[in-house]
Amino acid sequence: MDEIKTLLVDFFPQAKHFGIILIKAVIVFCIGFYFSFFLRNKTMKLLSKKDEILANFVAQVTFILILIITTIIALSTLGVQTTSIITVLGTVGIAVALALKDYLSSIAGGIILIILHPFKKGDIIEISGLEGKVEALNFFNTSLRLHDGRLAVLPNRSVANSNIINSNNTACRRIEWVCGVGYGSDIELVHKTIKDVIDTMEKIDKNMPTFIGITDFGSSSLNFTIRVWAKIEDGIFNVRSELIERIKNALDANHIEIPFNKLDIAIKNQDSSK
């Protein structure tokens, strides 16, 4: 009985002391957690005016770093030796780095993209044959909305090591199209017909150089290559479609043949008596 009383006498002060320490640690963690959210949102608000890609990436890094520091301080408040924590984290970090080297290289790739700044949110870019609008640069990956509506998520390490074509660095973009006409066509008439179509299209930038000329002798057609420039804001695909449609109608109106493959089938009658 005396032993139980002794245990209870020792337990309650210790429990009270540990409870106070635990409450302090929880308060420290809650404050740090709230502060990390506050600083992340503040960073997003300040930097998004300049560049949303930069703002999103820096905000994520800031949030994670403050959360790690807060966790270490909270554990230190509980009496855990921070030097031991750092040592363990270092050892675990090496093991994790070896196991997740691709993810770490993606983080490094994201930092490189932030420093070099080859694109920003909303830019139309082409990476490894994929073209679309940049939606976000995250901690590990870059989100690209393709023209058909699909979302491509590319690792930052791949993006940083790939050739990036940014179509938003210029107000105009060149449209190239090959049009085949019959070998018997009047070349000057074909040239004039196509030029008249281009001259009447308001969406074609007349200040940029235009090219219309024969570039190849096809198997069944003279191939004219047409190069014009259109404003990005007008929609390159829409302008190209309208240009092709107008040229087709103009060639038909001038009775200029557009060759196409034909298949002739010859049926030979055989004498059934043989």
From Swiss-Prot:
Cytoplasmic side, ranges: 45-56, 101-274
Signal peptide extent: none
Main subcellular location: membrane
Gene Ontology CC: plasma membrane
Transmembrane segments: 22-44, 57-77, 80-100
Subcellular localization, as worded in the UniProt entry: Cell inner membrane
Pfam families hit by this protein: MS_channel_1st, MS_channel_2nd, MS_channel_3rd
Topological type in the membrane: Multi-pass membrane protein
Keyword match Transcription: no
One annotated GO molecular function: mechanosensitive monoatomic ion channel activity
Superkingdom of this protein's organism: Bacteria
Periplasmic topology ranges: 1-21, 78-79
Sorted UniProt keywords: Cell inner membrane, Cell membrane, Ion channel, Ion transport, Membrane, Transmembrane, Transmembrane helix, Transport
Known role: Mechanosensitive channel that participates in the regulation of osmotic pressure changes within the cell, opening in response to stretch forces in the membrane lipid bilayer, without the need for other proteins. Contributes to normal resistance to hypoosmotic shock. Forms an ion channel of 1.0 nanosiemens conductance with a slight preference for anions.
Quaternary structure and partners: Homoheptamer.
Protein family according to the UniProt entry: Belongs to the MscS (TC 1.A.23) family.
Name the record gives this protein: Small-conductance mechanosensitive channel
Source species: Helicobacter pylori (strain UM084)
Lineage: Bacteria, Pseudomonadati, Campylobacterota, Epsilonproteobacteria, Campylobacterales
